[in-house]
Every structure is written in structure tokens, then in C-alpha cells.
């Protein structure tokens, strides 16, 4: 897979958001959230912040293998490899992972949102969700182009199958609906099966989480 392969939206400006590894008040805020079993994806998915999110979920699993973990998402998408590391960690740990989006869950952000524990996938009322196919630059020699094109095609099918599994649609339906940028309002995402609830108040979410 090309390192350029991503499922970030074409033409979409980079989302401003916290990056792991800084210092100061922002770090203190995110450490406080972690103590409350909340991890936050607030920027483009990159290998660096994906590693941090995986480590945080593994830590929370080690501390309590039963209590829910909350993954909050406001992301334009990004690295497929980074996103798949987060996805596999969500499946690996024993905890339910509740996913919550505000602002935007686009591309890989949508994929991770929909991959949350069934019944515990949430959107705030004005969130926007984007589903589409992975993007990747293909260059080099003819042989390299053919290899990368096959990898991109395989990645497209793999992600589409997982999206189908988590949303209750067929692979064919997901491939058709995501062939071009497909934007959803929170309510439309609920009706399509990408999420389970549209909530405007945190107390509603907590009521769905008996382990908290």
C-alpha cells in the first residue's frame, strides 16, 4: 500500500485539531478525559496519533477489561494503515467501544464511527458524516503502478466489506453508495445504519452505558 493511500476527502481542508505529543493545557485536558475513559480523535488520522489512540485503549483495557471506552471523533479521515490499527485495536480489546461524533466524521472517521459497538454509536445533531472510497496516488514504473493499483482495489473492497458488516448493508450496496462522496446528516446516518442514536445531551449517552 502506498504511504499516500488515505480515505481523506478530496479537496477538503485539513481539520484543525489536537496532536498527541504537545505540551501544556491541551495535554492536561486530554489526560483528564483519559481518566474518564474517553479518547479523542480530533484531527486527521495519522500513524502517530493512531499509535497513541491504540496505546490509550490498550491501557484502559488493562485497567478495566469490562468498562466502556468512549471514542470521540471529529476528523476528516486520513491514513488507512493508521485507521486500521485503531479499528483492529477496537476489535481486539474486550471492552465495548462507544463512538461519538461531533462536527465531522469523514472517510476513515466515518469508518471508525460505524465500527463502534452496536447500539453504542452516536452522533450529535449537527454532525456531518462522509462515506466514500479510499484515495491513493499511483506513480512510478508500470510494474509499480500495477502493484499499487491492485493494492488500492483490494483495500477498497476490504473497507467496503467491513462497512457493510457494521451497517447491515450488502457489499454491493456499500460499493454503489460510496462510489462518490456520500454525505449524511446525523439523522440520515441513523436511518442508513451508520450510527444507532442521535443525541443532543451527554446524559442521554450515559444512560445507554450501564458499565459507567
UniProtKB/Swiss-Prot annotation:
Pfam families: CLP_protease. Residues 1-20 are annotated as: Disordered. GO terms for molecular function: ATP-dependent peptidase activity; ATPase binding; serine-type endopeptidase activity. The active site is at residues 107, 132. GO terms for cellular component: cytoplasm; endopeptidase Clp complex. It catalyses: Hydrolysis of proteins to small peptides in the presence of ATP and magnesium. alpha-casein is the usual test substrate. In the absence of ATP, only oligopeptides shorter than five residues are hydrolyzed (such as succinyl-Leu-Tyr-|-NHMec, and Leu-Tyr-Leu-|-Tyr-Trp, in which cleavage of the -Tyr-|-Leu- and -Tyr-|-Trp bonds also occurs). Keywords: Cytoplasm, Hydrolase, Protease, Serine protease. Its EC number is 3.4.21.92. One of its GO terms (biological process) is protein quality control for misfolded or incompletely synthesized proteins. It is found in: Cytoplasm. Gene3D superfamilies: 2-enoyl-CoA Hydratase, Chain A, domain 1. Cleaves peptides in various proteins in a process that requires ATP hydrolysis. Has a chymotrypsin-like activity. Plays a major role in the degradation of misfolded proteins. NCBIfam families: PRK00277.1 (NF001368), PRK12553.1 (NF009205). Fourteen ClpP subunits assemble into 2 heptameric rings which stack back to back to give a disk-like structure with a central cavity, resembling the structure of eukaryotic proteasomes. Belongs to the peptidase S14 family. This is ATP-dependent Clp protease proteolytic subunit 2. It comes from Cutibacterium acnes (strain DSM 16379 / KPA171202) (Propionibacterium acnes). The gene is clpP2.
Amino acid at each position: 500500500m502506498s504511504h499516500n493511500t488515505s480515505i481523506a476527502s478530496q479537496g477538503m481542508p485539513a481539520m484543525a485539531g489536537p496532536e498527541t505529543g504537545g505540551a501544556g493545557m491541551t495535554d492536561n485536558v486530554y489526560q483528564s478525559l483519559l481518566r474518564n475513559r474517553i479518547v479523542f480523535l480530533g484531527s486527521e488520522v495519522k500513524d502517530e496519533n493512531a499509535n497513541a489512540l491504540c496505546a490509550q485503549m490498550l491501557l484502559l483495557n488493562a485497567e478495566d477489561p469490562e468498562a466502556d471506552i468512549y471514542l470521540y471523533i471529529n476528523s476528516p479521515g486520513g491514513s488507512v494503515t493508521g485507521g486500521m490499527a485503531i479499528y483492529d485495536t477496537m476489535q481486539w480489546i474486550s471492552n465495548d467501544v462507544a463512538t461519538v461524533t461531533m462536527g465531522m466524521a469523514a472517510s476513515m472517521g466515518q469508518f471508525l464511527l460505524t465500527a463502534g459497538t452496536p447500539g453504542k454509536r452516536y452522533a450529535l445533531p449537527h454532525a456531518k458524516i462522509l462515506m466514500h472510497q479510499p484515495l491513493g496516488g499511483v506513480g512510478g514504473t508500470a510494474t509499480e503502478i500495477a502493484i499499487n493499483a491492485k493494492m488500492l482495489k483490494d483495500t477498497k473492497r476490504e473497507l467496503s466489506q467491513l462497512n457493510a458488516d457494521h451497517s447491515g448493508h450488502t457489499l454491493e450496496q456499500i460499493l454503489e453508495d460510496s462510489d462518490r462522496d456520500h454525505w449524511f446528516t446525523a439523522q440520515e446516518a441513523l436511518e442508513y445504519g451508520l450510527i444507532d442514536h442521535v443525541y443532543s445531551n451527554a446524559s442521554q449517552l450515559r444512560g445507554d452505558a450501564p458499565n459507567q
